[in-house]
A protein has these predicted regions:
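The conserved 3'-phosphoadenosine-5'-phosphosulfate
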Residues: 220-294
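Conserved beta-strand scaffold positions in the cores of enzyme catalytic domains, especially
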Residues: 95, 155, 227-229
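Short His-Asn-centered micro-motif
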Residues: 73-76, 97-98, 133-139, 158-160, ...
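Conserved phosphate-donor/acceptor-positioning beta-strand/loop module used by diverse small-molecule
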Residues: 146-172
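PAPS-dependent sulfotransferase catalytic domain
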Residues: 112-126, 137-140, 167-170, 174-242
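Short, surface-exposed basic-aromatic patches at helix termini and helix-loop junctions that form
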Residues: 86-90, 145-156, 247-249
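PAPS-dependent sulfotransferase catalytic core
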Residues: 1-120, 171, 176-203, 260-310
């Protein structure tokens, strides 16, 4: 059977995975494949092998309007994967975690691919239930374009207060490597705040990235009327309330019994990115305490950096705290 462009835009079985130059790469998926794919980047677990390559120019000629889509935007290492997986019902709505194509757009020109990508991501198996997209740090910098295109879409900004963010981002060599890489990649967005980025310390990079994201969220909140904020510490401390509110916000049909089962089950007792590893909130807090003394110099430096920009930081946080996710 020959696929048409209409088929590609209609069925989630044809997943726009990434762009390779002027070519869009589709991989075969089904509902089970989406559910088991914790991430939809290189770690995707497709329904079968193989890929379909289609010229981007052909797809852009006839982009349909995106269907209503919910968004989880986050600062990284803050429980976003846990929240997204908790909202994912294998028999109901789709939750797309960190689509590779969307991430790529954060580093490319505004050439029509965002409309193409959001239309492809908005597909669903059940028309009566929402599709939710969980972004990543680079996709935060698409927010001006996303908000302009879909100002009515429901969105959650999952964030951490500065000190908790620093604990999460600076706690290991691997996390610091990630921080250096992503801030270098996003240099045009965060480099101006700290001058010569290649000379910046890890603490300065972390502080600059945190502030840039807080300001993006605050600016977007003024455009997207259905945007709400969620302090990740509140999510970790009371996941039942947070998950109940998130499900209601996105229109995900989770009953109180289903929510209690998820919060009390394996999902919240294992590492969200690796279900084979036991990990809960108590482990997270213990890890935080273990690194507090080790990070004291970095914490002080980052907090001084933010203190010099207190007006911007306080304004952004005040805006977010004025739109809390609530049941």
């Amino acid at each position: 059977m020959t696929l048409t462009l209409a088929d590609l835009y209609a069925s989630p079985d044809h997943y726009l995975h990434s762009f390779d130059g002027d070519t869009a790469v589709f991989v075969p998926m089904d509902r089970a494949a989406y559910h088991r794919s914790i991430f939809l980047d290189a770690r995707i677990s497709p329904a079968e092998d193989g890929a379909l390559r289609v010229p981007v120019a052909a797809l852009i000629e006839s982009i349909p309007a995106s269907l209503p889509t919910g968004w989880i935007m986050h600062v990284a290492h803050c429980g976003s994967t846990l929240l997204a997986r908790a909202l994912d019902d294998a028999d109901a709505n789709l939750v797309l975690r960190e689509p590779q194509a969307l991430r790529q757009l954060a580093f490319g020109p505004p050439d029509g691919r965002l409309a193409l990508t959001t239309a492809m991501l908005s597909k669903r198996y059940r028309p009566d239930l929402p599709t939710i997209v969980k972004g990543n740090v680079p996709t935060n910098f698409l927010l001006p374009r996303i908000s302009a295109a879909t100002p009515d879409a429901p969105m959650i900004f999952l964030y951490l207060p500065l000190r908790e963010y620093l604990f999460a981002i600076l706690r290991s060599d691997n996390h610091r490597t990630w921080l250096r890489n992503v801030t270098t990649q996003l240099g045009k967005h965060v480099g101006g705040a700290i001058g010569a980025l290649h000379n910046a310390s890890d603490a300065q990079r972390a502080a600059a990235l945190w502030l840039a994201q807080m300001q993006l969220y605050a600016d977007t909140a003024g455009i997207m009327v259905n945007a709400r904020s969620l302090d990740a510490e509140m999510f970790f401390a009371d996941p039942t309330t947070a998950l109940t509110a998130a499900a209601a916000h996105f229109g995900v049909p989770l009953s109180p019994r289903e929510i209690e089962a998820r919060v009390g089950g394996a999902l919240f007792a294992t590492y969200s990115k690796n279900p084979a590893q036991s990990f809960g909130n108590a482990d997270r807090l213990a890890r935080r305490n273990d690194v507090e003394a080790e990070l004291s110099v970095d914490l002080d430096e980052a907090e001084r950096w933010i203190a010099a920009r207190e007006t911007e930081a306080s304004s952004a946080l005040a805006t977010l705290r004025a739109i809390p996710l609530a049941v």
